[in-house]
Amino acid sequence: MEIIGYYESPNQQELIGKIRACDWSAARFLADLLEKGTFDETLGGWGYLFLLLDGENLISFATLTGQDAVRDESLTPWIGFVFTNPEYRGHRYAGKVLAHAEKMAAKLGYGRVYLETNHVGLYEKYGYVYLENRIDCWGEDARVLYKELEEVE
């Protein structure tokens, strides 16, 4: 198993296909952003997409971006689009991708990351703390969580 960066991969079209095949509407939205080249523009001007692969199989993925569905420029960066394929759930693979994104955020000089979700208890087990509820860009209520990051040399 390995975590790769989408933008460093020579197989971007293949990865878009794997993301689009996930049974989650947000994954299809992410695939559209990548295909149209609007990922950075839509998500705060910059971003990373990390994918955990087992050979050719997509296990899990997450993004690290300047903005997410909760629009507030004072809160940055965001981890989003966190997904683990159902057949791989229960093994904490999302935690591996989260940790990778968190490490990148720390390398970029950030001391905290944010995440918005409707799940209760899922991200808390990875050290995330509830901040508050906010209305997202679709007008829906979302829980905003954060995590303090350790400095990386």
Describe the role of every protein-language-model region.
Residues L49-L51, N57-Q67, W78, F83:
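Conserved beta-strand in the GNAT
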Residues G47, E140-L145:
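Short hydrophobic/aromatic beta-strand or adjacent loop that forms the aromatic wall/cage
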Residues D68-T76, F81, P86, H91-Y93:
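Helix-adjacent hinge/juxtasegments
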Residues M1-G37, E151-E153:
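Short amphipathic alpha-helix that is part of the acyltransferase structural core
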Residues K107, G111, T117-D141:
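Conserved active-site alpha-helix within GNAT-family acetyltransferase domains
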Residues D40-G45:
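Short loop/turn motifs at secondary-structure junctions and domain boundaries
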Residues Y88, R92-H100, Y110:
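Conserved acetyl-CoA pyrophosphate-binding loop and the N-cap/start of the following alpha-helix
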Residues L53-G55, K147-E148:
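Active-site beta-strand termini and strand-to-loop segments that position acidic
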